[in-house]
């Protein structure tokens, strides 16, 4: 097996200096809180000691004094004054008792003085942090990013320096503050994508060390519309017969005749649901529509059998042949459009051309209908207004974003949609050119890369599905067999096995080897291996190295039939660590699909951006493999927008039109074959060349249509997921998960899990509440600087981590507001690397960065299977 690291890597650079995180903290407040806690502990210790001494006097006192001494003892222990009671004691005894109590009183006085000093200083600490937070609005890049990320909040943000920089802001300013703090931490301490907060850049590795010529001081900006409103407006046309006038129709590409004369249509419908958060998200609802044999279906399929016809032409033909009125024929045809047998040609958006609405505008203009023409003009206004945002700044940018939102509202109104625009109506990407990179050199070994490949396969839940598919193939076609009807095989696999399997919930306590579904292809072995790995990483105490169990004939891998791919490319998001640190690099969690590493921002970097994919394509060709893109279905989110990065695309039934790939292969023309020596299935072209599907979008595969998900099972796992943090069992107390590594590669930071039910009640932004939070933080063993994510009991994955320093009063208050009342737990991870350890230095401006690293694992055909 050969390892080849990509020559070009992507950097995601922080949008604010790392010093910002330290500026938004108050070390003096933390020092004061710790002194208060120390003083309180000292007082408690002295009270207990004094109580023990007074107990001796109580035992030896005559009956007439015992009651008074008991009351004095209780008062001292509970922190109440007892001066009068002590003075009333007999001479001699009063002096003895006073001497016992005096150290307690001195310590209590010191504590009271310390607490009073904190109450005096606390408003200054809060105002100081808020003043520094407000000063970030003077950073043009950050402020402009907020205008796009938080549209409509401009007035509140502008008011924050005047109304929010106080000891106790009002409710509106606190809400504004929480949003501002969230984006400040995201920009300064975590290279989060998709905004002006974190521009991207390209660099290359030469002889193992990164080289970068010159980093410009300002990023290039490019704004474009969100295609979510576009897809929603165009998708709504099929629901209204009146809006079908003049539009071209075609038969669905997923129609399958049945033996009884009826038709089956695999229909994919995107459901757009408004949410309080204004998320631009849709779910792909897939179903098989079974149409019985009917005269109307026969006539329509005959009419559209030769190609596309406009709606009125099909209505006229149907009315004439079926003896229907035009009205009834139109209703019948509109119903077939809704059922999916007939589709509007050219209105579905392909990732290659969706940024220009594909062919939709041309089709709408050619329809000859006033509503269609009005919709085309609305699309023009939306695109023009969104494109203009990138060239604006300050107050003009706020007005520009407002105009974009107005354009979306007009678009929805013209399309007849009763819906609210999403929160994000314009996307802005920023890029830096090549520059001087002064980060640490890359120091990983080939053995570690190979182990990462094994881990990626082991952790990928789809590996169980790959085993199921191969088991089904061997059973239905035969071991080493070939199947020429690939779409038919995928449909049968889904109908007979996969669909039922995916709707089940596995009992984590049951023996997987006895599960009848998991016996196909011995898929149960992968489930068992994942369980064993989970047990292994949960059992470790301080640090766990997985390298020995991911190489050789380890017990964990024994019995697994690891697939051998002739060419395989993996992505990981990582931060390189300096010499002498905890390792060579830290692998970060990937939110989404790693194909975005070479697609999402490629257009911002010109020919070099496309070279990342072209280099992979050439290396795959040398290994006898052709990489071929799969579209991921109709585009409805900017997460999947990209130009044609590979030379070939596989066209599946139901794919959107608009592909710009130079070469297009119909899935119908490929062959699926079993390769027992490589323990996998492979797609093969007619000339014998292996074709490896490559989904290049960022949207997670589970959100794409089922055909894409099934086809992706014929490709290897393409990223190294680091979801090593298991759920905290319900009813459990805090627990610490060890740091996990593969040799020098850290794949999980040391993490403490704490139930939200144990969070302190007081407000940390008060002198009374903050020491309680510091005490709780220390008692729970949480690091002073950390990344915190909230996980719930709702089955959803944990949210994105947020950088937090316990000395940051405002940040802690904003975070605790998010955690309060949630049923779940916090994942508190060590801040590795420290913010000062992995930075880009630019004219005394230090920025955190994250690398999108890629590498190949290739197996020559002559080698034996890896196991």
Segments (PLM) and residue ranges:
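Acidic, low-complexity/disordered tracts enriched in E/D and polar residues
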Residues: 1-6, 10, 183-305, 424
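Type-3 copper protein
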Residues: 1-224, 329-634, 796-867
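Segments forming glycine/polar-rich beta-alpha architectures that bind adenosine-containing cofactors
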Residues: 233-236, 243-258, 466-480, 664-667, ...
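Histidine-dependent nucleotide/RNA phosphoesterase domain, centered on the 2H-phosphoesterase fold
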Residues: 303-309, 341-344
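Short acidic, hydrophobic short linear motifs in intrinsically disordered regions
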Residues: 307-320
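Short, basic interhelical loop/turn and adjoining N-cap
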Residues: 321-328
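C-terminal structured domains
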Residues: 580-838, 843-860
